[in-house]
Curated annotation (Swiss-Prot):
Keywords: Ribonucleoprotein, Ribosomal protein, RNA-binding, rRNA-binding. One of its GO terms (biological process) is cytoplasmic translation. Belongs to the universal ribosomal protein uL22 family. It comes from the Archaea. Disulfide bonds: none annotated. GO terms for cellular component: cytosolic large ribosomal subunit. InterPro entries: Ribosomal_uL22 (IPR001063), Ribosomal_uL22_euk/arc (IPR005721), Ribosomal_uL22_sf (IPR036394). The keyword Cytoplasm does not apply. This is Large ribosomal subunit protein uL22. Part of the 50S ribosomal subunit. SUPFAM superfamilies: Ribosomal protein L22. The keyword Metal-binding does not apply. The lineage of its organism: Archaea, Thermoproteota, Thermoprotei, Thermoproteales, Thermoproteaceae. The gene is rpl22.
């Protein structure tokens, strides 16, 4: 049983978030959520992917992450970029990028779950926009690696709790194509 099952945003907070970001009032029935607890993947890469897909439509996020899995398009790295290689990227102004394939696969599964939840609630999937995506550290799995001469080295495996919240927005507010917001903060 997962230890952390709570979303960081309640339905009321998600409604307020949609109003602040898009200036549109939606009801709690127009919001779909998906949660993936204790995934064995990199927390740093998960934060970057979650930050990147926020603001995209469900279709845009799925197509971009499928291209990441195929190693066609990268994810821009904003925070955890020390000593990272600079790549030829499809955008200008942000040369640090990675192809986190394992994280992209897990996010694709989560987005599939989100799409099914949206369909179950009766939402139009073409107008569903990701308004919140977050990756939080989960608990550590303690392991021991046997070494030579009777020694043992302890190492921990990090888990990640990922949540995605989407809302059905009016057609005039839904982004037609995704513009990369790569301005340095």
């Amino acid at each position: 049983m997962p230890r952390h099952q709570n979303y960081s945003l309640s339905d009321e907070a998600a409604v307020q978030l949609v109003f602040r970001k898009y200036g549109v009032k939606v009801s709690a029935e127009q919001i779909a959520k998906a949660y993936a607890p204790e995934q064995k993947m990199s927390w740093k890469k998960s934060v970057e992917v979650a930050r990147f897909i926020e603001g995209m439509t469900l279709r845009q996020a799925k197509s971009w992450l499928e291209d990441v899995v195929k190693m066609k398009r990268p994810i821009p790295i904003r925070t955890f970029k020390k000593k990272q290689a600079h790549h030829a990227t499809p955008w200008s102004g942000w040369p640090v990028a990675k192809w986190p394939v394992k994280v992209a696969r897990r996010f694709l599964d989560l987005l599939e779950n989100l799409e099914n939840n949206a369909r179950f609630r009766g939402l139009d999937v073409e107008r569903v926009v990701i308004v919140h995506a977050a990756a939080h550290k989960g608990y550590r799995i303690h392991n021991i690696m046997p070494r030579a001469f009777g020694r043992a080295t302890r190492f921990d495996e990090q888990t990640v709790n990922v949540e995605v919240i989407a809302a059905e927005l009016p057609q005039q507010v839904v982004p037609k194509r995704y513009r990369l917001n790569l301005v340095k903060r």
